Amino acid sequence: SVVEPIEPVFVDYEKDMKQFKAEGLNVLYVQNKVNDIAKLNYIYDKGTESDPILNLAFNYLSYLGTPTRTAEEIAEEMYQLACSFSLRAGSSSTNIAVNGLDENLPKAMEIVEDLIYNAVPDETILENLKTDMLKSRTDAKLNQSSCFNALQRYVMYGPDFITKTTICNEELKNLTSEELLGTIRNLMECEHEILYY
């Protein structure tokens, strides 16, 4: 039998995607017609180039609980909702994502926002993270490919790039829980875009 050639279908942004404002924020919405899984992304035009401690702050937050939930209870609750979340900062943008069953997304977002705004600091966890990061940096200096990658970044982006996107060891040692959590809370107040699929 002969297979008929497939005709290309071009995206019609007016028909295939809805754009609207919600509480002053741009929202791009595409309905998932395949299954009940939804993805909600908050995209910020701010990354590690403008705030080098973002990823450390996100990493720290992932170990914390709130006054009403421990980190383990948050993980269990998200599991029960069939949802997950991630916080990632790239060099020029940051993405806070919540994925899972569409019907449970509002509850999952509540949990994530509660964690962001009400995280209970834990100095032991912070000190362990700092120690791990300092050890990782020491190990990277002994690794040839890490040194080569740093050299490539230096050549491509210039000498200021590394100092702009990386905090020095002394600054790392002096970071406080309040600074890290404040960085995330301040990010939440920045203008951002919402992608919902």
Segments (PLM) and residue ranges:
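His/Glu-based metal-binding/catalytic segments typifying zinc-dependent metallopeptidases
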Residues: 1-2, 7-12, 17-54
